[in-house]
Amino acid sequence: MLSKSPAPQNTLDRLTAAALAWGEGTYARWAAPVGAIAFSLYILLTAFMALTMPDANWDMLPYLAIAEEGAYPDAQALHDYAYSTVQAGVSAADYKALTDDGGGFRSHMAQHAADFHSLLGMYRIKFLYAEMLSTMSSVMSPVEAMRVLQVVSVLLFGMITLLWLRTEGVLALAPVAGAVLIMADFGDAARASTPDLLCSALFLGGLLAYVRGREAATAVLLFLAFMARPDNIVFLAIFAVLLLVFRQRAWGALAGFAASFVAYFAISHWAQHPGWWPHLWFSSIEQHYNMDGFEPPFSVGAYLKAFAASFIRAISINSWVGVSVLALAAWFALGRAGFRLDRRAGILLAALVLGVLAKFTVFPIHDTRIYFPNLLPPYLLLVGPVMALWASASLNGRRPIAIPGDKP
């Protein structure tokens, strides 16, 4: 049974209550700027960590190779360039970790240029990232260019998030967005030298443009996000189908999908991508040392084994499943309370959720970075219903609260 809190009995209690009331009132008046400043500090700290404490991952080598492939047509020369460039840009301990795993995959690739070159089709398809690295490498060292590109991606992602919150009038909730990013391993994505965060920033910008009805910007940004990571075609296809089924007018998103659909086949052919099944085999079943002509027969058993292994890893060591389930629970709870998204936003949220499920089904890999673009947007879409619920609770809170045992 609930009961009223006892009235302060001494000076200390009264001072504490007064201080809490003052703090609550002050924060309520300054919640928006405080939220924006707190989130900005988090973004700046993340950018600083990306620049000063970057993660030296093996994917740096093939990404640097494809960025300068035109200047080194010979496989051995390209191999030597990539490895020497990374060696000059990372610590001795990091370089040893990238090139010596006791005779395993990394040791083999450090010594066999032809096999290393055969893997590049799986990286060459990230066309936009490679071109940006190549351009930036003309004015700075290639490894430094990777780090600067990560910093730019972090800042761009943070700016778009703040802009989204500002357009909704909910900058006070910016720290909550920061908490979601922490749960979604934003820091790890920022420190990794991969195209994932660049794609996420462009993707988030495209979704904001869609929500605001800026069709041209939607088309351009979603297409650029696809060019950074072509696996975004899965989300774009689902989004386009939902828009057509529910007859939602959004030519920007449809144009972005159409352009990406055409570009997907053109880029795959140009990049000499090995294909879906060989790539899945390499990523989730077994790291094959030479992808030239590698065409393993499709096996339902091998696919299901890869699916199960990735699913177990995803729920045990990664965060994207939990973040996604929490967003779904919030969507359901708000809907049951009568605070629903409008039609346009609801279609987008459904596409984001289905996009994660479809991406994992098509290409079961457990890493959070693969699904990161889809993790924050559902929460940003739900801020409207959350604020409506908050306003409703505030209005109801003005009425006297009946406490069992009280006399009328």
Language-model region placement:
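Perimembrane helix-loop-helix junctions
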Residues: 14-15, 234-261, 336
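Loop-to-helix entry region of an early transmembrane alpha helix in multi-pass inner-membrane enzymes
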Residues: 115-127, 131, 139-156
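Interfacial juxtamembrane loops and adjacent helix segments
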Residues: 73-122
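Membrane-interface helix-loop-helix junctions at transmembrane boundaries of multi-pass membrane enzymes
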Residues: 167, 247-254, 329-350
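Hydrophobic, aromatic-rich transmembrane alpha-helices
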Residues: 313-343, 355
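Specific aromatic-rich, kink-prone transmembrane helix
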Residues: 160, 180, 198-217, 377-381
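Transmembrane-helix signature of polytopic, membrane-embedded enzymes
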Residues: 144-145, 161-183, 201
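Membrane-interface alpha helices of multi-pass inner-membrane proteins
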Residues: 204-206, 216-230, 236-244, 259
